[in-house]
């Protein structure tokens, strides 16, 4: 029987081109890029090169490109970052009730720290009903 994988929101297969590009770092180039020894400096150079490539691809400045360890960490950064950057404009954040736990838990944390969270209900197809407003 042919396998059908349906959990792409959790993880996805790695494209061969990506694996080929990453394999040297999995095998030998795994130094801590914050370290001062040679293997760390090599890792930092590779990380900087990757950052430059991504920045060029999305037409941004390399200083605006951040790498995270996972989607949950990226979600946390995004929500905390927006909340902090815009706190002078208000403390009300609106999201949906079906967000990933990384967003929902961050929202709960922000509520405990003075933010007002609104969790919009969604329709069976996942869309938001404008009548709720």
Task: Show the residue positions of the predicted features.
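Pyridoxal 5′-phosphate
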Residues: 1-133
């Amino acid at each position: 029987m042919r396998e059908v994988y349906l959990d792409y929101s959790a993880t996805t297969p790695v494209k061969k081109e990506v694996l080929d590009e990453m394999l040297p770092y999995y095998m030998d180039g795994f130094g801590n890029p914050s370290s001062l020894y040679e293997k760390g400096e090599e890792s930092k150079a590779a990380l900087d090169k990757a950052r430059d490539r991504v920045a060029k691809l999305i037409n941004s400045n390399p200083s605006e490109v951040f790498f995270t360890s996972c989607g949950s960490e990226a979600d946390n950064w995004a929500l905390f970052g927006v909340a902090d950057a815009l706190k002078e404009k208000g403390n009300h954040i609106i999201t949906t009730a079906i967000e990933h736990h990384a967003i929902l838990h961050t929202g709960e944390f922000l509520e405990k720290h003075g933010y007002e969270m609104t969790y919009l209900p969604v329709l069976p197809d996942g869309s938001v009903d404008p009548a709720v407003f």
